[in-house]
């Protein structure tokens, strides 16, 4: 078990290389042209910043000093 305490980082690197190879292999199977052709429509985005628009504290441009 002495070797494990010295060379644990090699096992981590082997694990990360395996994960990386599996990700590359899975990404090769994705057909991006088919996905883009049948892309679903996104619903309209609603943010909650519209209530801040009413609290406009900016000075008016045509005010005289």
Swiss-Prot record:
Main location (coarse class): membrane
Annotated region described as Disordered, given as residue ranges: 39-65
InterPro entries attached to this UniProt entry: UPF0370 (IPR020910)
Presence of the UniProt keyword Cell membrane in the record: yes
Sorted UniProt keywords: Cell membrane, Membrane, Transmembrane, Transmembrane helix
Coiled-coil regions listed in the entry: none
Protein name: UPF0370 protein Ent638_2968
Organism, scientific name: Enterobacter sp. (strain 638)
């Amino acid at each position: 078990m002495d070797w494990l305490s010295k060379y644990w980082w090699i096992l981590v690197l082997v694990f990360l290389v395996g994960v990386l190879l599996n990700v590359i292999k899975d990404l090769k199977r994705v057909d991006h042209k088919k996905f883009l052709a049948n892309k679903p429509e996104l619903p309209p985005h609603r943010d909650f910043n519209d209530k801040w628009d009413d609290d406009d504290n900016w000075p008016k441009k045509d005010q005289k000093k």
